[in-house]
Structure formats: structure tokens, C-alpha cells
């Protein structure tokens, strides 16, 4: 009986550790995808006459259909980061009003920023922007549709 109790205690410790590892892995995936988005955004910028804006809401660096020649927007990378966080979509230019727990991507001709909530409870958000910032914050850094920096 004592052996069974010890096995039960050890298995609960192992299961708790596995859950923590999964959450940290999801946070790493969020950060990795958003880092890839930054590189993709610069390719988009260079191919789009030094602009992150394609002229319409459906052709900018954040949109799902954005193209600059043959260079795709960052939407798929931000969406992958959102999926790692358990979110099914990305709010483009704050169509959801900057609500907490939402993945956001805003852009203008001169800049862009993307933010995704981290999976770890209480860890907040991870935000990247066209200025090179990579910030983890417990507050929502993109709270209106003019926010294109993580500050």
C-alpha cells in the first residue's frame, strides 16, 4: 500500500512537470513564430517600395492576403503564434478593439507591430515590431489601431 502511494505521488509530480514543459514549449513557439514574422515583414517592406502598406486593408503586411510581388505578408506567422497560444484568429488593425487575450497585428506604411498572449498563466503578452523590439509584458501593448510599436 505504501508503494502504491509513493508511485501515485511520483506520477503526479511527473504529470505536473510535463504540463509546465508543454506550456513553456508553447511560449517558445509563440516567440519563434513572431521572430520569423519580423524577418518576413522586412522582405515584404523591401519588395513593396519601402512600405508595410499595400494600399488597401487586404494587402498590407498584416493581412491574410497581403502580397508584395511574390512576398507574402506576416499573417501566417502571427496566426501560427496565435495557434500556439490557443487562439484561432488574428485581429488585424484591432478589429476586436484591443481586447485582452487576443492576437493583434497592426500596420501603417511606416511600421507594424504584432502581439500574442503567452500560454503561461500570468506571463502576459509577447510583442514584436518593425523597430526590432521583442518585449514580454504583462500589459496589453497594442491597445488601439494606431499602435505600431511595442512601447
Residue ranges: model-predicted function:
Residues 89-106, 115:
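Short, surface-exposed beta-strand/loop micro-motifs that present aromatic residues
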Residues 35-64, 80-89, 93:
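Alpha-helix exit/C-cap motif
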Residues 56-57, 92-100, 121-122, 144-145:
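Disulfide-bonded cysteine motifs in exported proteins
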Residues 1-18, 22, 26:
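N-terminal single-pass transmembrane signal-anchor helix
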Residues 59-62, 66-82, 107-110, 143-144, ...:
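N-terminal helix-rich module
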Residues 21-40:
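Membrane-proximal extracytoplasmic alpha-helices
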Residues 108-151:
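Short, surface-exposed interaction loops/tails
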Amino acid at each position: 500500500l505504501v508503494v502504491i502511494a509513493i508511485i501515485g505521488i511520483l506520477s503526479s509530480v511527473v504529470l505536473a512537470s510535463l504540463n509546465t514543459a508543454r506550456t513553456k514549449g508553447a511560449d517558445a513557439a509563440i516567440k519563434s513564430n513572431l521572430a520569423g514574422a519580423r524577418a518576413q515583414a522586412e522582405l515584404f517592406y523591401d519588395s513593396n517600395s519601402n512600405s508595410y502598406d499595400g494600399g488597401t486593408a487586404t494587402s498590407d503586411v498584416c493581412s491574410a492576403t497581403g502580397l508584395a510581388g511574390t512576398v507574402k505578408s506576416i499573417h501566417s506567422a502571427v496566426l501560427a503564434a496565435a495557434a500556439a497560444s490557443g487562439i484561432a484568429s488574428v485581429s488585424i488593425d484591432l478589429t476586436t478593439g484591443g481586447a485582452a487575450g487576443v492576437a493583434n497585428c497592426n500596420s501603417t506604411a511606416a511600421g507594424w507591430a504584432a502581439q500574442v498572449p503567452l500560454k503561461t498563466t500570468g506571463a502576459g503578452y509577447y510583442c514584436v515590431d518593425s523597430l526590432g523590439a521583442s518585449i514580454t509584458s504583462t500589459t496589453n501593448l497594442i491597445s488601439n489601431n494606431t499602435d505600431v510599436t511595442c512601447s
